[in-house]
Amino acid sequence: MQRLTVEQFREAGKTPLVVVLDDVRSMYNVGSVFRTGDAFRIEALYLCGISATPPATEIHKTALGAEDSVAWRHFDNALEAVELLKGQGYEVLAVEQCDGSTKLNEFIPIKGKPYAVVLGNEVKGVHQEVRDACDACLEIPQFGTKHSMNVSVTAGIIMYKFVF
């Protein structure tokens, strides 16, 4: 298997997807999202609020160096990131169980269209004001008792949907 160098990755074409983390508290989750973002060659990862930023040992432990390949940026809050992305022509989707949310299996992304997905805090989810600023909500259908998943697992499922 041929792997890209960090430099080759930075120059390679990207999936037109920005992942926005809204106050994700676990550095291990942040690192896992970096690693999955590298695997799916996303455009960027926006770390907002209390979401940790590199360099951090805990991020590196799960990212395995993907924090060096995936473009990232920090915002004081996710609302700033959402407003910027919308101004740049992205369709911004909160990944959250909301009234009127679209089930992920029913959502068909338009190839080549720029999207951003907002994933929320492990306990509180996406802040209400951020959800309100998004164009729509996506929901992963679930059948268990918890009706929630780890944010890094959710990120992987969502990224896969936009690539394939």
Feature map (PLM): residue ranges:
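Post-transcriptional modification and biogenesis factors for structured RNAs
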Residues: 1-164
